[in-house]
Amino acid sequence: MTEYVGNHSLLLQQIQRDNLGTQEEPLAGRLTGKTALITAAGQGIGRATALAYVDEGATVWATDINPATLESLDLTPGITTRVLDVTDTAAVRAIIDEIGTPDILFNCAGFVAGGNILECSDQDWDFSFNLNVRAMFHMMQAVLPGMVEKGGGSIINMSSVASSLQGVVNRFVYSASKAAVLGMTKSVAADFVGQGIRVNAIAPATVQTPSLDDRINASPDPVQARKDFIARQPMGRLGNPEEIASLAVYLGSDETEYITGSVQVIDGGMTL
């Protein structure tokens, strides 16, 4: 009996060793080994994307102009936060000098201005184009030399269906700026396609974010304002940040090596 138990124990140990040798390695994430720089990462789509990127194995630099919104991300392994005003060209250059050239740049920062052309002042125009277009131009300009040197990279620009894709009521300067983003995206994609750099745009419809809540709550009738936003969505609901983040993961991954200069519409059927 003693000999049997001893042999049985040895047999169990051998089986355990064999099993350890045949266990499959954990699957690598779709962004494993990549670094990503995300603007406006403190909330909404930017935050959801930062978390999705880390889940897929990326090392993330999450930036935002508001330090308070970055605090919870500081606790997430794989994410390093920095306060960044993307309209400050010197600050943009400084962060690239600090972190080096990322494999992925997600230009998510932007501002939704309301009103029609008669309600748009020069100051409104300048603010929207400075944040929605000029800042994006400087972000791309800062990372492109390093991406060229590395032999590739992925740039993702946040646009909107309220652009050259569809006319949306009371979105004059916002739509003009987001149309500019589409033109800029295609131009940069064409210029750098031969150097392994992919440049694509995401064009969402209305997405449930803190900034949307702020706009709704600032309206005379918040309940009706929310109903109006939902009413223009054929699916009967708003998008959520995680859905946009999933698309950003796809565009940042090697799965899209053959996609550049595209406009990825994710709008719940709004442009049908």
Could you describe each region identified by the protein language model?
Residues 145, 190-191, 257:
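Alpha-helical segment proximal to the catalytic Tyr-Lys
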Residues 116-117, 121-129, 229:
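Substrate-binding pocket helix/loop in short-chain dehydrogenase/reductase
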Residues 137, 237-266, 271:
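C-terminal substrate-recognition "lid" of short-chain dehydrogenase/reductases
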